[in-house]
Amino acid sequence: MIIRKNESDHRSPYALYVLGSLPDENVKSAAIVGARNCTSYGEQMALQYGKCLGHAGVQVISGMARGIDGAGQRGALNGDGTTFAVLGCGVDVCYPRENIGLYMDIQKKGGNHIGISTRNEPLARNFPMRNRIISGLAEWILVIEAKEKSGSLITADFALDQGKDVYALPGPVTSALSQGCHETDPAGSGNTDHTGRTDG
C-alpha cells in the first residue's frame, strides 16, 4: 500500500515501525538523496531544494544520513515544511549519532521516523530495503551528488521501476561525486538546474 500503489510490486517489508505517523497520502511528497561525503556545493543545493520544497508544502522524504540526505531534511525544516526520516535501523535509534539534533527537530516540527525494526543498530543489509521504502513513499526523487555506484542510485533505480520520475542535479564533469547523476538512466528521468526547472 504505502510502499507502492501499483499492485505489480509485491516485495513489501514484513513491517514498518513508525514513531509518529506516515506521510499524508493526500499531500505531495518528494525524496532528496545523495552522497554522504558530499561537497559544500552539494550540501548547499540540498539545503536550498529542501527549503523550497518545504516552503511549497511538499513532504520531504530521506534517510537522515550524513551529507545530502540530512541537508535536504534540514532545508525542509528551515522552510517550515515536514520531513520524514526512513532509517536503516530501529526507529528509536539515531544513526548517525551526529544527526541527533536533526532527529529531535524532525519530531518537534511534525515529521516522523520510519524504521524497519525496533531497537536494532544499523546493519548493511537493511539499507537497500530502506532505500526502496524512501522511493516508495515519495512521488518523485531528486539525486544530488552520487558516485557511479551508490545507494542513491539504488534508490533512483527503485523509483524508475515504480514508474516514478527521477531528477538528477548536474555537477562538474570532472567530479566523481557527480558521475552517478550524469549517468542516471534518462528513461523517466531528467536533469534539473538551480532554479528547479527540469529538462526531462
Spans of features found by a protein language model:
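Glycine-biased, small-residue-rich flexible motifs in mid-sequence functional cores and linkers
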Residues: 1-200
